[in-house]
From Swiss-Prot:
GO molecular function terms listed in the Swiss-Prot or TrEMBL record: amidophosphoribosyltransferase activity
Protein name in the entry: Amidophosphoribosyltransferase
Lineage: Bacteria, Pseudomonadati, Pseudomonadota, Alphaproteobacteria, Hyphomicrobiales
Stored NCBIfam families: purF
Species annotation: Rhizobium etli (strain ATCC 51251 / DSM 11541 / JCM 21823 / NBRC 15573 / CFN 42)
Pfam families reported in the protein's UniProt record: GATase_7 (PF13537), Pribosyltran (PF00156)
Protein family membership: In the C-terminal section; belongs to the purine/pyrimidine phosphoribosyltransferase family.
InterPro entries: GATase_2_dom, Ntn_hydrolases_N, PRibTrfase_dom, PRTase-like, PurF, PurF_N
Gene coding for it: purF
Domain (Glutamine amidotransferase type-2) ranges: 22-241
Length: 496
């Protein structure tokens, strides 16, 4: 296999936002498979900016390109795409939540099996990945990366089933957590989604060839047709037959569970033009802002979004409240990201590199700042300072999601619980004082549910994954202090 390398550069990073782990894209049977995969990954760049990789197969051998950095930094080069021939391809954009930032962790990961090679790309996180890794190492396995995705390759290799498809299914039956996953062999493209449906995965079609990707925006960029969402717990096996036709076999190997898609796909992660779970993301975010205005009104002169995530919600807030909307903060979209762990001091400095106050829209006014979420509060603090320096008379923060109390273990890069702003202060008033705002309010959990799904949260059977707000984890967390960790956190939430 070919493998290309490049090296990371250090760029400023805002460490007060949540980050999704990955985006995946795969296509089977198309002569321009790698080029289409690169375009799909470009549309999914928001899901991971640390690294991107593509694997292809041309009927004889597998080819691989893996690079640190953005998709456009490498895969717009015709020479790079020329090194990825073939009609089968999968690709991956990465933001690490498990495993260090290193070339050996850049996906897709590849392994040679007795019946041929297999490559895997994975979005999400396995909550028993570390436990399984320790088990396979104890029995003689040698791991080449620190990514939890590699565990799947080992389980596939150890499976006693005859076909690669059955080996793959045998492996994912042992995995717990939230994931969407693509695998490719010499003739197959396999898609899988976790039994709870925490991470999204969609199926599309271009020129009669099947496509799987994290979001519909990756279908739109190449003019592909959306077919349907991959169902929770579903495995879809697409295979090129000897006559050139493509067979599609959909299976449900896991015990059916109620789907609980991650709410943060709507709050922050998914691109606004994507359709996730049958819902336009932009519309749900605008609904969040409208509900926020109903729940937490304030006398003000202007509604200003914290770009870019807060923009749809700010539009909704302005529409519902009747307060004019203005771009009072301008974002620099050309500030890069870092591949080192930044200090809090560097994090705070990075805010001004990304955001500038538009004084003409702010000076002398009472400002409502609308953001999608608050994690540590460091960004909010600096933005409030910036808005006051630009002459705002009052600054009121409205957040289009509930307070975050609990860490995530399903593919979102969240701090430890004690680093979250909501756990550092006794009440919202104390948080507002820390940030320097005249007032602070968060959208209620029911307000969020109504914005996305049209009805209140069902506490007996929540319609979405919302553990970061409620402590109600949808699966056990075997790697985190044993099987009872999820129940303990849920009890903490109910007692809080």
């Amino acid at each position: 296999m070919n493998q290309s390398h490049s090296f990371p550069t250090d760029d400023p990073l805002d460490g007060d936002t949540l980050h999704e782990e990955c985006g995946v894209f795969g296509i089977l049977g198309h002569p321009d498979a790698a080029a289409l995969t690169a375009l799909g990954l470009h549309a999914l760049q928001h899901r991971g900016q640390e690294a991107a990789g593509i694997v292809s197969f041309d009927g004889k051998r597998f080819y691989q390109e893996r690079h640190m950095g953005l998709v456009g930094d490498h895969y717009t080069n015709p020479m790079t795409l020329a090194r990825l021939p073939g009609s089968i391809s999968i690709g991956h954009t990465r933001y690490s939540t498990t495993g260090e930032v290193a070339m050996r962790n850049v996906q897709p990961l590849f392994a040679e099996l007795e019946e041929g090679g297999i490559a895997i790309a994975h979005n999400g996180n396995f909550t028993n990945g570390l436990t399984l890794r320790r088990q396979i190492i104890a029995t003689g396995a040698i791991c080449q990366s620190t990514s939890d995705t590699e565990v799947v390759l080992h389980l596939i290799a150890r499976s006693r089933h005859a076909s690669t498809s059955d080996r793959f299914i045998d492996a994912i039956r042992q995995m717990e957590g939230g994931y969407s996953m693509l695998a490719m062999t010499r003739t197959k493209l396999i898609a899988a989604r976790d039994p709870t449906g925490i991470r999204p995965l969609v199926m599309g079609e271009l020129d009669g060839k099947p496509i799987f990707c994290s979001e519909t925006c990756a279908l739109d960029i190449i003019g592909a047709k959306f077919i349907r969402d991959v169902e929770n717990g579903e495995v879809i096996i697409c295979e090129i037959q000897p006559d050139g036709s493509i067979s599609i076999d959909a299976r449900k190997p896991s015990k059916p569970q109620p789907e609980r898609l991650c709410l943060f796909e709507y709050v922050y992660f998914a691109r606004p033009d994507s359709v996730v779970g049958g819902r336009n993301v932009y519309t749900t975010r605008k609904n969040m802002g409208m509900n926020l205005a109903k729940e937490s009104p304030v006398d003000a002169d202007v509604v200003v979004p914290v770009p870019d995530g807060g923009t749809p919600a700010a539009l909704g807030y302005a529409q519902e409240s009747g307060i004019p909307f203005e771009y009072g903060i301008i974002r620099n979209h050309y500030v890069g990201r870092t591949f080192i762990e930044p200090t809090q001091q560097i994090r705070a400095f990075g805010v001004k590199l990304k955001h500038s106050a538009n004084r003409a829209m702010i000076e002398g006014k009472r400002v409502v700042l609308v953001d999608d979420s608050i994690v540590r509060g460091t960004t909010s603090l600096k933005i409030v300072q910036m808005i006051r320096e630009a002459g705002a008379r009052e600054v009121h923060i409205r957040v289009a999601s509930p307070m975050i109390f609990f860490p995530d273990f399903y593919g979102i890069d969240t701090p430890d619980a004690d680093k979250l702003l909501a756990n550092q202060y006794a009440d919202v008033e104390a948080m507002a004082k820390y940030i320097g705002a005249d007032s602070l309010a968060f959208l209620s959990i029911n307000g969020l549910y109504r914005a996305v799904g049209g009805e209140d949260r069902n506490p007996a059977r929540p319609q979405f994954t919302d553990h970061y707000f409620t402590g109600d984890y949808p699966t056990r967390l075997l790697d985190k202090n044993g099987e009872s960790m999820g129940n303990k956190l849920s009890m903490l939430a109910s007692n809080g």
